[in-house]
């Protein structure tokens, strides 16, 4: 039962974003089709191209040209799409200003990476920040992955061996924030390389899929 606790916590997060049109399974399918499943190698590939900003966050930008559509038309289309997609307690629209031509939203994708072993198990979630700057015939997308939100459960094999009452009390669970500069491949000395590798690859996948979806909405 203890071994299933983290899986249940991850599942609860997945159910919480069921209303979103962008799910973890869709992102993972996209990532596997595009890059494969060698998480560490793919993370190293991205690490060679990625540069963390002054806040140790990853920032992605893309400019989409939409011929023949005015600023107001693009705003209406995007605002409608965001209302459908970011519509629950975990993901939401933070700002929608038609006059300024700005839409800002906060996304959420739980369970992008999971690892169990050693002393603890980990379930990694991301909460990307999305901004659209809208002009006539053009939308500039900016997506920021600020960190990894991690649920850590001390239920690993070593915890079981060292705790005589392992099965008699609930495991210790804590929510952590992992700074990207402390995670592989940005940090070479990372005790959770496998988890960090998949988290980075899935973050890239989320951004790519989200950008594609936004472009299709225009």
Which residue ranges define each predicted feature?
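Bacterial Sec-dependent N-terminal signal peptides
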Residues: 1-24
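Ser/Thr-rich, low-complexity intrinsically disordered terminal regions
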Residues: 20-218
């Amino acid at each position: 039962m203890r071994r299933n606790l983290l899986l249940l916590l991850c599942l609860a997060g997945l159910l919480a974003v069921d209303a979103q049109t962008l799910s973890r399974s869709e992102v993972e399918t996209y990532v596997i089709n595009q890059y494969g499943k060698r998480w560490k190698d793919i993370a190293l590939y991205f690490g060679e191209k990625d540069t963390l900003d002054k806040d140790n966050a990853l920032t992605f930008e893309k400019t989409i040209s939409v011929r023949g559509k005015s600023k107001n038309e693009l705003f209406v289309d995007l605002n409608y799409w965001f209302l459908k997609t970011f519509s629950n307690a975990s993901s939401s629209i933070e700002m929608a200003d038609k006059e300024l031509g700005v839409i800002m939203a906060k996304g959420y994708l739980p369970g992008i990476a999971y690892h169990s072993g050693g002393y603890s198990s980990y379930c990694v979630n991301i909460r990307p920040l999305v901004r659209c700057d809208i002009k006539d015939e053009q939308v500039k997308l900016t997506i920021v992955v600020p960190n990894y939100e991690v649920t850590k459960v001390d239920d690993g094999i070593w915890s079981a061996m060292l705790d005589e009452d392992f099965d008699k009390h609930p495991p210790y669970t804590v929510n952590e924030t992992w700074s990207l500069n402390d995670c592989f491949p940005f940090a070479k000395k990372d005790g959770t390389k496998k988890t960090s590798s998949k988290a980075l690859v899935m973050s890239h996948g989320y951004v790519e899929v989200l950008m594609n979806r936004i472009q299709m909405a225009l």
